[in-house]
């Protein structure tokens, strides 16, 4: 349903932010 899709989108967004934060800390280069 819509709620689940929203939840998935939010989870993906958070995962992306965490990944970016990790890259800032470790200095890895995003493609």
From Swiss-Prot:
Pfam families: Antimicrobial_2. Keywords: Amphibian defense peptide, Antibiotic, Antimicrobial, Disulfide bond, Secreted. Expressed by the skin glands. Disulfide bonds join 23-28. The keyword Disulfide bond applies. One of its GO terms (cellular component) is extracellular region. InterPro entries: Antimicrobial_frog_2. The keyword Disulfide bond applies. GO terms for biological process: defense response to bacterium. It is found in: Secreted. Belongs to the frog skin active peptide (FSAP) family. Ranatuerin subfamily. Antibacterial activity against Gram-positive bacterium S.aureus (MIC=60 uM). Shows no detectable hemolytic activity towards human erythrocytes. This is Ranatuerin-2. It comes from Aquarana catesbeiana. The lineage of its organism: Eukaryota, Metazoa, Chordata, Craniata, Vertebrata.
């Amino acid at each position: 349903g819509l709620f689940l899709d929203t939840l998935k989108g939010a989870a993906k967004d958070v995962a992306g932010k965490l990944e970016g934060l990790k890259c800032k800390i470790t200095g890895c280069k995003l493609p």
